[in-house]
Amino acid sequence: MTTIRRSFAITGLLGLAVLMAGSAISAPKKGYIANIEALTERNQDFRRVLYTGKHMQLVVMTIRPGEDIGEEVHDSTDQFFRIEKGEGELRIDGVASRVRSDDAFIVPAGASHNVVNTGKAPLKLYTIYAPPEHRDGIVRATRAEAHATDAHFDGKTTE
């Protein structure tokens, strides 16, 4: 084999090795950093997925006066809520509790639950699903749209 061919073969193999190694190396994770209070208060959408990790998901929601999230059960997902603005009623397995700005609550997996806006202004909250519940990046402007086109988590994360 001539020197030129040998050099080309070695260079080609090295290039292939680098290419293959590069595909195995993942980019550094960035995570998610934001002023969640400001994002929650500015949000106008019924549901907006901000970040989806492998084991949890951050979502902001706005519930209009007189509306609710909708009675639901997540069999294998725990859910944390924090109310930033407004007032409402939380129902967990038929037990109702009043909730308002600065309240936080957790709904365990398997519990039937709903959040109803009982106030005159939009109810602004953020929620954390563990594990994720919705497809990453989903934005649903209204409750009707969210219920008509619900897209469950497909395994794809934000990063």
Model-identified regions with their sequence ranges:
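A short, N-terminal "cap"/entry segment at the start of jelly-roll beta-barrel domains
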Residues: 4-7, 16-57, 70, 136-159
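Short, conserved beta-strand element in jelly-roll/cupin
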Residues: 62-64, 73-90, 128
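Short histidine-centered beta-strand/loop micro-motifs
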Residues: 48-50, 61, 70-74, 116-118
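Short acidic-glycine-tyrosine-enriched beta hairpin
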Residues: 95-109
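Ligand-binding loop in jelly-roll beta-barrel domains
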Residues: 109-135
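Structural motif
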Residues: 80, 87-89, 96, 112, ...
